[in-house]
């Protein structure tokens, strides 16, 4: 009977150790996800700004070309 309580202690220690390892793994995964999110956010913002700037530049280029063509083909007075 005395050995049974010793086994319970060993199994309790084993379950505690496994539980601690599992909790550490979950904590590490959460930390990695937060780090990845924190890293991706500025890159995403930079890409959005680059796309917006490119679209605005292209729009200005088309407007300038349209104005130049319109001026060139307009009848002279």
From Swiss-Prot:
Disulfide bonds: none annotated. One of its GO terms (cellular component) is chlorosome envelope. The keyword Cell membrane does not apply. The keyword Disulfide bond does not apply. It is found in: Chlorosome, Chlorosome envelope. GO terms for molecular function: bacteriochlorophyll binding. This is Chlorosome envelope protein F. It comes from Chlorobaculum tepidum (strain ATCC 49652 / DSM 12025 / NBRC 103806 / TLS).
